[in-house]
């Protein structure tokens, strides 16, 4: 028997590429997570449909996230495999798409909590293996589907409590006093700029990594008064297979521990009364206990919106409704079209003028129902209002992004000259555009936690949208090694792809009533809300300055030959460096330029000018701050 776990573990990159090129197209429409209503032998443990069989909710969202296509195929999150029933008709497998196979077509019945393949049976669990069976009424055949809270796997950000203080300030998970020492308490502090101890990354294996140190993770601390259900939280050295250091986020936005799956991270005390509030690992009083609910900042709210089930605009197909729509469209556009919705994505029209024209329109005598006319008129006014605000958000983002890269060639040449790098050479460097963007937006949210996430929300959505687009179109941001002579062309191509991805997201939203409504609502959330897209009052000059500095740093890292990188050793620890030419030391620690595979092996004599002058340039660009970006930005 080939089960789900067997196939998922046997897949590799070359197989995935083959599947992409040979499979029949079936475009995924939206992502979902399927949770079994079966509680396990202890009647507590939750189980989820996973590419590694049914397990508890884990941090690696990709293995428990599925894509449902409009024709009923259920894809893995990568889009490379689909669910199918085995030839024996019992176990479920992950296989290559075959659009002619009825057993690869599934129906999700959210009313009765059932998932059915085309053979008429029902998705079931047999000793934690996924199978199909005739209807039996057991809990193992009952599933609930939902969009799980976004998990910032691989991205830096804050874990903010949903509970605000009396002044509507957000509080975040924080390492006490920003200490890099192990066994330091993890507490709650008000989210603030440049507090590196508040920034975390959820790794693919479920560890929550602190930005303070590359080996510092969230761990369970000592018991509270000897309790077996209440613990403090500490930092500790990373241990690969320690379940006490591994975490997940469930559909209630609770961060639970993999060793104690019924215990979640919360806090005791009142936010705002004390400058520091203690965090605990304990059992929430309920699924809605707000003291145990968290928001990842940035939330990447657009990711969720563009992944949801499409919701079309209200249809006007006949009678006075259709006549009203066509008349208003024609009147608003001065006779250009009788379908105004077709222009929402057009960059050459003024939607504000359309709105004024629709508002001033009066019902003609040819339309008998003034109620139908008013209904359509109000709907189109709402649509135009939403479209205007959505376009404004993306136009501002595009302006920021264009400014960031507008002098890309000049900046690249200047930096190369400063550190004696020959941009015409065939020296291979790491042209990792995604890493560069990650560094830029980490810098923004670190320096401007209130508001910076708005830019990051759009950018990260563009990156992920581009990756999905690339899977089916061989286009989008690419990550590979290039020669110095090709670096600018490579970066420019990725920049143009990124701009195109943002445009695709905007157009996707503007062509869907549900997505447009949800995005419009985000445009009016308070700026300090992690899901906000409210650009009013944002200091774009400050954001651009921070982003430009971080991008220059990322470029310098790219200009290093691929076998060299920047290492960091905290103050008080031994730094393996033999020459000051290869290092810089300040109060936080020592930064070293050395080979990726050997931190004791430094650049050869031929790169002497490169190595020494590059450190001088780093100093000029606020060295300690920038190397801090480089330390974790890759």
From Swiss-Prot:
Q: Its topology with respect to the membrane?
A: Peripheral membrane protein
Q: A GO CC term? A: nucleus
Keywords of this entry:
Cytoplasm, Lectin, Membrane, Repeat
Q: What induces it?
A: Induced by high levels of extracellular Ca(2+).
* InterPro entries reported in the protein's UniProt record: Ca_Up-reg_Membrane_Reg (IPR051780), Ricin_B-like_lectins (IPR035992), Ricin_B_lectin (IPR000772)
Q: Does the keyword Membrane apply?
A: yes
Q: Where in the cell is it found?
A: Cytoplasm; Membrane
| Record GO biological process | response to cation stress
The family database entries (SUPFAM superfamilies) matched by this protein are listed as:
Ricin B-like lectins
Q: Disordered: where is this region?
A: 1-23
Would you say which domain of life the source belongs to? Eukaryota
Domain Ricin B-type lectin intervals:
27-146, 117-250
List, in alphabetical order, the Gene Ontology terms for molecular function in this entry.
Answer: carbohydrate binding
> To which protein family does this belong?
Belongs to the cup family.
Protein purpose: May play an important role in stabilizing and/or regulating the cell membrane during Ca(2+) stress or certain stages of development.
Q: What is this protein called?
A: Calcium up-regulated protein D
């Amino acid at each position: 028997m080939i089960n789900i776990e067997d196939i998922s573990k046997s897949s590799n990159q070359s197989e995935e590429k083959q599947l992409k090129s040979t499979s029949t197209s079936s475009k995924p429409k939206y992502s979902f997570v399927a949770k079994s209503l079966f509680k396990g032998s202890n009647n507590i443990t939750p189980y989820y449909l996973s590419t590694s069989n049914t397990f508890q909710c884990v941090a690696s969202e990709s293995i428990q996230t599925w894509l449902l296509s409009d024709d009923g195929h259920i894809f893995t999150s990568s889009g490379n495999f689909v669910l199918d029933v085995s030839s024996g008709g019992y176990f479920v497998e992950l296989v290559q798409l075959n659009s002619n196979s009825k057993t690869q077509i599934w129906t999700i019945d959210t009313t009765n909590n059932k998932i059915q393949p085309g053979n008429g049976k029902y998705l079931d669990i047999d000793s934690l293996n996924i199978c199909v069976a005739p209807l039996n009424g057991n809990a193992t055949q009952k599933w609930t589907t939902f969009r799980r809270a976004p998990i910032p796997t691989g991205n830096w950000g804050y874990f903010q409590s949903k509970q605000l203080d009396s002044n509507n300030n957000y509080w975040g998970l924080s390492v006490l006093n920003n200490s890099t020492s192990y066994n330091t308490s993890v507490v709650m502090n008000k989210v603030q700029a440049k507090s590196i101890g508040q920034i975390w990354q959820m790794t693919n294996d479920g560890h929550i990594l602190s930005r303070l140190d590359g080996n510092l993770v969230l761990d369970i601390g000592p018991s509270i008064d000897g309790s077996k259900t209440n613990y403090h939280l500490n930092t500790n050295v990373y241990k690969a297979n320690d379940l006490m250091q591994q975490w997940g986020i469930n559909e209630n936005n609770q961060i639970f521990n993999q060793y104690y799956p019924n215990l979640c991270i919360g806090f005791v005390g009142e936010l705002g009364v004390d400058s520091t509030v203690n965090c605990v690992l304990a059992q929430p009083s309920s699924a809605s206990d707000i003291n145990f609910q968290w928001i990842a900042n940035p939330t990447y709210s657009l990711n969720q919106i563009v992944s949801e089930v499409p919701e079309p605009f209200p249809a006007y197909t006949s009678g006075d409704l259709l006549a009203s729509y066509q008349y208003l469209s024609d009147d608003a556009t001065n006779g250009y079209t009788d379908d105004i919705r077709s222009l929402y994505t057009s960059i050459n029209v003024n939607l504000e003028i359309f709105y004024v024209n629709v508002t001033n329109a009066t019902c003609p005598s040819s339309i008998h129902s003034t109620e139908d006319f008013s209904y359509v008129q109000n709907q189109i006014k709402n649509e135009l209002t939403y479209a205007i605000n959505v376009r404004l958000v993306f136009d501002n983002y595009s302006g920021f992004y264009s400014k960031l890269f507008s002098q890309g060639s000049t900046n690249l040449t200047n930096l190369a000259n400063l550190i004696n790098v020959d941009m015409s050479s065939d020296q291979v460097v790491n042209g990792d555009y995604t890493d560069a963007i990650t560094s830029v937006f980490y810098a923004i949210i670190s320096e401007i936690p209130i508001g910076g996430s708005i830019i990051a929300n759009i950018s990260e959505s563009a990156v992920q949208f581009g990756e999905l687009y690339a899977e089916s179109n061989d286009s989008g941001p690419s990550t590979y090694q290039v020669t110095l002579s090709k670096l600018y062309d490579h970066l420019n191509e990725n920049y143009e792809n990124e701009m195109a991805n943002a445009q695709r997201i905007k157009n996707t939203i503007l062509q869907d009533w549900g997505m447009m409504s949800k995005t419009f609502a985000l445009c009016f959330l308070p700026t300090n809300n992690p899901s906000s897209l409210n650009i009013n009052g944002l200091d774009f000059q400050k954001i651009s300055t921070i982003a430009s500095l971080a991008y220059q740093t990322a470029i310098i890292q790219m200009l290093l030959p691929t076998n060299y990188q920047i290492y960091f050793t905290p103050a008080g620890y031994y730094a393996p460096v033999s020459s000051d030419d290869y290092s810089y030391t300040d109060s936080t620690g020592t930064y070293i330029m050395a080979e990726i595979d050997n931190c004791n092996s430094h650049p050869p004599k031929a790169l002497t000018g490169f190595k020494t002058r590059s450190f001088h340039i780093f100093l000029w660009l606020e060295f300690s701050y920038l190397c801090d970006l480089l330390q974790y930005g890759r």
